[in-house]
Amino acid sequence: MKGGKSKGESKKAETKLAVNKKGAAATKGGKKPAKGKEPKDPNKPKRPPSAFFVFMADFREQYKKDHPNNKSVAAVGKACGEEWKSLSEEEKAPYVDRALKKKEEYEITLQAYNKKLEGKDDEEGSDKSKSEVNDEDEDEEDEEDEDDD
């Protein structure tokens, strides 16, 4: 057999293909969803911005006024980062204070959100238990009906 492959060669080729397929899926960004991970709640309050992000919001507005033709997000981010690094601690202080205030507000809203969740969980848990009890009663009645036949 001039052009044919031996059994050993074909098995090697198959295992190489299998390895490549596994590797290709991982490299193409085909992430598997995490098992047991709950989906994010859209009603949950967002985390507060850090001092840098508070600064960046102000800087972005000023940068757009000074450079109206610049549409590059990367350029704005780079300029902002360089400006932030050049600031002294005294110059950063107002942004740190604003970030702390936002963090305190976040903690208050998060506590309120968690209280709402606890209330919903208690109500849902009692509803579920009632329905489960009702389902069990119905099942027992069905079994009794079958015994009568």
From Swiss-Prot:
This is HMG1/2-like protein. Residues 1-15, 35-44 have a biased composition (Basic and acidic residues). Residues 45-114 bind DNA. Transmembrane segments: none annotated. Gene3D superfamilies: High mobility group box domain. Residues 1-52, 112-149 are annotated as: Disordered. GO terms for molecular function: chromatin binding; DNA binding; structural constituent of chromatin. It is found in: Nucleus. GO terms for biological process: chromatin organization. It comes from the Eukaryota. One of its GO terms (cellular component) is chromatin. Residues 134-149 have a biased composition (Acidic residues). Keywords: DNA-binding, Nucleus. Belongs to the HMGB family. PANTHER family: DNA-BINDING PROTEIN MNB1B, HIGH MOBILITY GROUP B PROTEIN 4-RELATED.
